[in-house]
Amino acid sequence: MKFVLPNRAMFIIGFIAFCAMLGEGAIADWSTNYLKNVIKTNDAIAPIGLSAFSAAMTIGRFGGDKLRALWGDKRLILVNSLLAVAGLLLTLLFPSAWVVITGLFVVGAGLSTIIPIVYSTAGHNKSLPNGVGLAMVTTLGYFGFLFGPPVIGFLADSQSLRIALLFVMVLFVRMLLMSRKIEE
């Protein structure tokens, strides 16, 4: 099989996967550090943020199919992108551990169904050979997951962790805008 460039639809879906998985990786790797060193919470409270994020991801993934059937893919990605933006805003704007933990829960709820939907959409794309769309989107998504945490670390070291997480916020906003262009 020869190399195939992504078409417009796969580029949009792949970019959304990149942003969502970069956000997942950043929250998984940096939320405890953020709570401990930026918000200045104690060692017993700091890991609760990651637990809240993970719990919301789990709940969302188990319940996502019902929402998907009710709202459709495009609307669900749009709403969940908005949730991810709102949750990260809560996390970054309010210096309270419990508000940050709530924000991380909202981010997890927002990101929870995006990856399953974009993988499904890519796998069912008829304009590319079987499996090629899924391979493209998965590659872009995992590039975000692997690329994100070290970039956040670099930005945190050179600026601050709050500034570094603003980079994730910019990607979440871009994901929200791109989700409006998904073809149904």
Where are these regions (language model features)?
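Small-residue hotspots at the loop-to-helix junctions and early N-terminal turns
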Residues: D43-S51, G131-A135
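Paired small-residue
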Residues: G87, W98-V106
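Short amphipathic helix-loop junctions that connect adjacent transmembrane helices
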Residues: D29-I45
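Structural signature of the two symmetry-related core transmembrane helices
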Residues: R75-L90
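Helix-to-loop junctions at the C-terminal end of transmembrane segments
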Residues: G60-G72, A156-D157
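Intracellular juxtamembrane helix-capping segments at the cytosolic ends
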Residues: S112-K126
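Pair of pore-lining "gating" transmembrane helices in MFS-fold secondary transporters
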Residues: N7-G23, F105-A109
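A late C-terminal transmembrane helix in Major Facilitator Superfamily
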Residues: S127-L161, V168
